[in-house]
């Protein structure tokens, strides 16, 4: 969230540390819209973003730069909102991509929308069931930002803020032409009717409800890394999804890094690991050998 395609300039050093950098074409996408990060999901408010990517942009890119044009040569990767995007695109288009690397993703399970269970009776974004204020961010174990305070700032900024970005993707369009708010801004009370609409964007729910169809197509393609102390409390959804994978003996790589936070999971070693995964899938030769084997 908040970055665009120019971030590739600052990531170049991380990329060039890979043994396979000269054999991999990296495309940095810009998911920023007037409403915020559209996460390449088709939505009532942002329009057919996923459809445009799959039907227009990728074919154009592959034809223009002779990139092969086959699903097994396409891989997804992203961090934070970009991590959610990578998972969303892979799960909804399992035959179009060869694998996804998902780092510190936005909530993959809306039972764990950070620290709030959106499906719970009387769910509230500001206070929990015991009346304690709900935190949105922390440093280590210490909460440093409350949800209510963040929402107050987000609403002042209007379109393009994080909360509004979620609603622009997940919510229906209201009679006023704007995304329907998921919760009451004064009280924090969650609107269950809106959450019922949101469920079609709940990635864990999509996988579980379509398990027989999706599991063989996604096997070996899912790689998720999060920090056990994610700054924005995003790791519980990752842990819940991994628990489901383990119960079903599903082939996925999910790693929750001890002492890791939101930013520290995105590192050069992960880029190298991701590239080795791609190299193994495509049987690429290691002709650079920048790292010791």
Where are these regions (language model features)?
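Non-catalytic cap/lid and distal C-terminal segments of serine-dependent acyl enzymes
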Residues: 1-293
């Amino acid at each position: 969230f908040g970055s665009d395609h120019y971030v590739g300039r600052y990531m170049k050093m991380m990329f060039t540390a890979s043994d396979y950098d000269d054999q991999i074409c990296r495309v940095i996408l810009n998911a920023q819209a007037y409403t915020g990060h559209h996460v390449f999901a088709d939505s009532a408010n942002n329009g057919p973003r996923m459809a445009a990517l799959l039907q227009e942009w990728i074919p154009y890119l592959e034809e223009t730069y002779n990139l092969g044009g086959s699903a097994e040569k396409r891989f997804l990767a992203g961090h934070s909102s970009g991590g959610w995007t990578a998972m969303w695109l892979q799960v909804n288009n399992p035959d179009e991509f060869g694998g996804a690397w998902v780092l510190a993703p936005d909530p993959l399970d809306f039972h764990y929308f950070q620290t709030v269970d959106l499906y719970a009776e009387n769910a509230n974004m500001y206070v929990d069931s015991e009346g304690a204020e709900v935190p949105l961010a922390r440093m280590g174990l210490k909460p440093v930002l409350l949800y209510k305070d963040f929402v107050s700032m987000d609403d002042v900024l209007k379109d393009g803020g994080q909360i509004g970005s979620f609603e622009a993707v997940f919510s229906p369009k209201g009679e006023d032409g704007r995304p329907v708010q998921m919760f009451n801004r004064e009280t924090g009370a969650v609107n269950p009717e809106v959450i019922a609409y949101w469920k079609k964007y709940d990635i864990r729910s999509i996988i579980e409800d379509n398990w027989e169809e999706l599991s063989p197509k996604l096997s070996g393609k899912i790689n998720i890394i999060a920090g056990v102390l994610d700054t924005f409390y995003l790791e519980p959804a990752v842990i819940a999804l991994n628990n489901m994978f383990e119960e079903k003996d599903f082939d996925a790589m999910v790693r929750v890094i001890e002492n890791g936070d939101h930013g520290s999971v995105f590192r050069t070693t992960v880029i190298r690991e991701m590239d080795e995964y791609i190299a193994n899938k495509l049987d690429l030769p290691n002709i650079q050998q920048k790292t010791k084997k």
